[in-house]
Amino acid sequence: AVMASNIDAFRTLRNRPHVVILGAGASVAAIPCGDKYGRKISVMDGFIDNLGMRDILAGSNFKSENLEDIYSELSKHQEYDEIREKLENSIRDYFSQYYLPEEPTIYDLLLLSLKEKDIVATFNWDPLLVLAYLRCREITLKLPQLLFLHGNVAVQLCLEEKRIFFQLYQGYCRQCQNQLSPCRLLYPVQQKNYNADPYIKNQWDRLKYYLSYAYIVTIFGYSAPATDIEAVNL
């Protein structure tokens, strides 16, 4: 009876999801030698120079090198709206240029090692996880679900059908033929409002649900900033 009880408990646990949470360090580890064209991906340290945004920010008087500090200040002052918009466009353009190398990456191996009940939630804007997912779909459809907690450059939305598409560039919905909208990127203000965007809110609500009964939680390459209260409270 005890053994049967243990087996039942094991089966119950086995059916619970493995939740994997990814940060910038995971994408760095995925392409340690650079992407398909040898481009290294940047973490937040040195981000301003790596994005070539030094000239864009020359019109402001910020001394901080921290992107979150800079973006938070830009968001507070209407006179910096043009600079902020250029910064946002630079971020989206920068991450949209990355392509996976031909050989399998950590992301490919991660996705293939998980099951359909499992979850991979990422804070990253870059398309590497999505590109790995699309590549793995050529092998199997039994892949984990993906959640994008800060949005992603490779996610397009059909607002009419409430469907998402994994692709880098805008196209048209296969159902209603309406033009797709780029997923909003949640930029690094000190007080993030995860409820302002319906898609982002949905991603966070789903993550909290899966975390509530997860069997295993793995955090890879992520260290929650003290200012990101929502992430810290997870």
Regions found by a protein language model. Name each.
Residues 132-138, 233-234:
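Short, aromatic/basic amphipathic alpha-helical patches
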Residues 1-129, 138, 225:
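Gly/serine-rich nucleotide phosphate-binding loop at the start of the catalytic core
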Residues 116-118, 143-144, 215:
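Short glycine-/polar-rich loops that comprise or flank the Walker A/P-loop
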Residues 14-16, 41, 53, 158-162, ...:
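Metal-dependent nucleotidyl/phosphoryl-transfer cores and adjacent nucleic-acid-binding surfaces
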Residues 136-147:
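A short alpha->loop->secondary-structure connector
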Residues 148-199:
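Cys/His-rich short segments
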Residues 29-31, 129-132, 156-159, 166-168, ...:
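Short helix/loop capping segments that flank catalytic or ligand/cofactor-binding pockets
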Residues 19-25, 121-124, 179-234:
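Glycine-rich anion-binding loop/nest that anchors nucleotide
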